[in-house]
């Protein structure tokens, strides 16, 4: 009975599904650390998109592997500078989740601050994909009762991991230590791993070794949603998320530092789009009136 179910889940994960009313059995506002579908494993990557993410997508494609990316809006880079990478993730059947707008420690924020961190990224993903994720990972795995309650109220499944490779400590010739951490977690029955696609050695060395080890153990690397038995239609909700839906950014990268308005241009190089439709980086552009659909706002 499990084989047909698993095959159906894989088929659903590999193709885009229309947004529809969600009927997920995966709980919201509760920390989840492990897969529930037998013989599956979820590779997850945090903190991107960044310079190495495209290479990682190439690697996953060459291995026939689907993964989950928990994205920030403004962290190592601005999500608006990597819109083509984000759309490629989605088109190739990977799962996109939220990692908050700016990698904030949610346990240090009040409900309004938590909501702001989530809805800022929802606005960005609405402009890029026309939809927002229902899965998220708290930065630092840090939550408290208020954070979980707020995230649950926003409809988010909260995903941690039971294998932390600590790859961020080994982005050099000690990357083998991160793989040892991975192997130890895998041997202990871990099924959800944490890595970061912002580190060169993770992408160039660690991921391939991890894929080899997963397959050698007879497990299938899949998205978090698939490993929890959740149909791909449930991984997202309609664009606009928990706040007001801005018009989608349709004009592409700005060629002349204009943005929004009738042209729909998106500011590049981490510039904000001011209320007057110009790209810049000072408070006049990034604070009051900033148009979050066309660049980051602070």
Swiss-Prot record:
Family: Belongs to the polysaccharide deacetylase family.
Top-level lineage group: Eukaryota
A GO MF label: chitin deacetylase activity
Reported pH dependence: Optimum pH is 8.
Residues bound to Co(2+): 47, 99, 103
Active site per UniProt: 46, 196
Pfam family, one: Polysacc_deac_1
Activity regulation (record text): Inhibited by Fe(2+) and to a lesser extent by Mn(2+).
Disulphide bridges, residue numbers: 259-273, 267-279, 272-286, 290-297
GO biological process: cell wall organization; chitin catabolic process; polysaccharide catabolic process; symbiont-mediated evasion of host immune response
Function: Hydrolyzes the N-acetamido groups of N-acetyl-D-glucosamine polymers in chitin to form chitosan and acetate. May play a role in evasion of the host immune response; plant chitinases liberate chitin molecules from the fungal cell wall which act as elicitors of the plant immune response, deacetylation of the liberated chitin neutralizes elicitor activity.
Protein name (record): Chitin deacetylase
Cellular compartments annotated: Secreted
Catalytic function, reaction form: [(1->4)-N-acetyl-beta-D-glucosaminyl](n) + n H2O = chitosan + n acetate
Activity under varying temperature: Optimum temperature is 55 degrees Celsius.
GO cellular component, one term: extracellular region
SUPFAM superfamilies for this protein: Glycoside hydrolase/deacetylase, Plant lectins/antimicrobial peptides
